[in-house]
Amino acid sequence: MFSNVGWGEILLLFIVGLIVIGPERLPRLMEDLKAAIVAARTAINNAKQNLDTDFGEEFDEIRKPMAQIAQIRSMSPKTAITRALFDGDDSFLDSFDPKKIMADDTAGQAHRQQVAKTGTTPEHAEVVERPADRIDPTQSPNTPGKNNDGGKPPAGGGYTWTDLI
C-alpha cells in the first residue's frame, strides 16, 4: 500500500503537518503516534504468544510438512532425484557426468595413441564400406538444400536419409 511512497512525499506530508498542526503541538502528536505504534506491536506479539501456547502442538504438526515442502521446493532437480532414489548418495550420477567421462582415459584415446605409435591400425580392425559411400560416376552430385528438379529445395530441408548414414 505504501510501497511507492518516496522521501519527497514524506517531506511534503511533514511540511503540511507542520503548517496545519503547528510547531507547538507537533512534538506531542509525534509522541502519541510513537506510543500507538508501540502499543500495536505489543498487542500483536501478545496475540502470537497466546496462539502459540493454545495451539502450539497443532501448529507444529502443520509446520513440519510445510517445512519439508519448502525444503523440497528449494532443491535442484539433481538433488531431488538423488534424495528420492538414492538416499542422497550422488556417486551413482557421477557416471553420467560428461566432464568426468571425458577426463577418463577412453578406448578411443588408447586406439589413437596406438595408431600414432605404430602408424597402422590394429590387425583385428576391419574397414567396412557402406553402400552410401559408393559414388556412381554417372550420377550428378546433390548438394544439401538443392534438388535436381529446377534448383528448388525439397520440403524436408534438402537432406536425405543417406546424409545421416
Curated annotation (Swiss-Prot):
Residue intervals passing through the bilayer: 2-22
Membrane topology value: Single-pass membrane protein
Stored Gene3D superfamilies: 1.20.5.3310
GO MF annotations, alphabetized: protein transmembrane transporter activity
GO BP annotations listed: protein transport by the Tat complex
Subcellular location: Cell membrane
Domain of life of the organism encoding this protein: Bacteria
Keyword Transmembrane: yes
Biased composition (Basic and acidic residues): 123-136
InterPro entries linked: TatA/B/E, TatB
Keyword presence, Transmembrane helix: yes
GO cellular component, one term: TAT protein transport complex
NCBIfam families referenced in this protein's UniProt entry, alphabetically: PRK00182.1, tatB
Sequence similarity: Belongs to the TatB family.
Protein name per UniProt: Sec-independent protein translocase protein TatB
Organism for this UniProt entry: Corynebacterium efficiens (strain DSM 44549 / YS-314 / AJ 12310 / JCM 11189 / NBRC 100395)
